[in-house]
């Protein structure tokens, strides 16, 4: 097993390709876009956040979803229109509530592990990605949310994360630019931020240097498992191609469900839309007023990252509305309002809105490993933690592929 096809050139596809190519595999990457990281990995919140590893599978999430169903400005919005996919996903989500604590701990451990690989990849290839190693600060205005954060912190501590509670005064000292009162927060000094799109694009060049071939602007129309391997059929413009690969790794985000079905597996990913605005800090006053420490407002479900001197990313919300990439003004406006509340001297006049679909599994834990048929592997379903977890799951996936190669050679 030497020639592996990776489906998807988002952050999980690129990190997987790099992990495989680094181990001597011949790798071909397929993506429908013109460049790497053009969909969900284009303009996310920018956080590499073990501190945000809590899975959502608890009754509190269900109750909030029901309460907010008719509020178009709610942080969590569920389109009440039923579909079998949505209903089956939600049923499985509720079925995973008993696994909430175990999955939160496992996810946090994975996130901690991922950091060293992500930084190693960047160091080996040699590139910058607007990284800010200033920690991540969770802030709270609600007593209920703050109490819940204390319970979550017990789980994160079990996973080995050093995350400390800070007072309202300490919050202000950690990020002096903050202009709103809080009850306090939690600070994780080891978390950091950066530009996911810049990272993925640079790492794709590192993959190319290792011999990886990228097939951009293609449509893979058929996946066939044969005795020789996995046969892919794809079109590029008007040209049709097919090739048999020794193995395939599905890293296709929200497209993974359909691909898995074609390969005989069930991967029940649902697309959960998130929004962001990139605020262009065009004036000196805004540059001074924008924070450098990354923030997470648990109540509003908003995260921030400073991407160099001139950009400030604000992201958040979760929308269960199918395969829909519409950028809705009533979902963007709360992000602007949040900025004006927390950082009133930052001008939001020049901001770029964006929406992406997070590939969410009902367990909130990514699917990493082999499928039912030989030569089929998955690294998908990372939800809101794609970048945070990607380097660890890429290495784990490469371990599975390498083990299969050794087994086949025996």
Residue ranges of model-derived segments:
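Glycine-rich phosphate/pyrophosphate-binding beta-alpha loops
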Residues: 53, 191, 301, 319-323, ...
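Glycine-rich FAD pyrophosphate-binding loop
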Residues: 22-42
């Amino acid at each position: 097993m030497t020639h592996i096809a990776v489906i998807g050139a988002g952050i999980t596809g690129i990190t997987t390709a790099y992990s495989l190519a680094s181990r001597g595999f011949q790798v071909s990457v397929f993506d429908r876009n013109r460049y790497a990281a053009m969909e969900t990995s284009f303009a996310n919140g920018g956080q590499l956040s073990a501190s945000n590893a809590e899975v959502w599978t608890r009754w509190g999430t269900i109750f909030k979803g029901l309460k907010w169903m008719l509020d178009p400005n709610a942080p969590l919005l569920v389109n009440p229109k039923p579909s079998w996919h949505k209903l089956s996903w939600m049923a499985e989500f509720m079925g995973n509530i008993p696994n909430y604590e175990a999955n939160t701990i496992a996810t946090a451990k994975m996130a901690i592990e991922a950091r060293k690989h992500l930084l190693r990849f960047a160091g080996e290839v040699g590139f910058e990605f607007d990284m800010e190693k200033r920690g991540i600060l969770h802030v709270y205005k609600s007593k209920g949310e703050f109490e819940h954060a204390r319970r979550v912190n017990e789980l994160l501590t079990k996973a080995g994360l050093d995350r400390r509670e800070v007072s309202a005064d300490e919050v202000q000292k950690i990020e002096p630019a903050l202009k709103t009162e809080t009850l306090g927060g939690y600070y994780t000094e080891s978390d950091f931020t950066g530009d996911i799109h810049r990272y993925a694009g640079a790492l794709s060049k590192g993959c190319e240097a290792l011999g990886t071939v990228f097939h951009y602007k293609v449509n893979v129309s058929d996946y066939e498992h044969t005795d020789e391997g996995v046969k892919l059929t794809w079109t590029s413009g008007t040209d049709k191609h097919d090739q048999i690969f020794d193995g395939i790794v599905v890293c296709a985000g929200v497209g993974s469900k359909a691909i898995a079905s074609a390969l005989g597996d069930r991967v029940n990913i649902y697309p959960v839309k998130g929004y962001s605005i990139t605020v262009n800090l065009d004036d000196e006053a805004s540059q001074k007023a924008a924070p450098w420490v990354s923030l997470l407002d648990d109540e509003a479900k908003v995260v921030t990252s400073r991407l160099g001197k001139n950009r400030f990313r604000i992201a958040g919300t979760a929308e269960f509305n199918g395969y829909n990439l519409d950028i809705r003004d009533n979902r963007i406006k709360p992000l602007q309002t949040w900025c004006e509340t927390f950082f009133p001297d930052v001008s939001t006049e020049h901001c770029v809105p964006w929406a992406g679909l997070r590939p969410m599994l009902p367990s909130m834990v990514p699917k990493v490993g082999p499928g039912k048929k030989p030569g089929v592997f998955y690294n998908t379903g990372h939800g809101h933690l794609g970048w945070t977890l990607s380097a660890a799951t890429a290495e784990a996936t490469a371990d599975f592929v390498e083990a299969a190669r050794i087994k086949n050679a025996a």
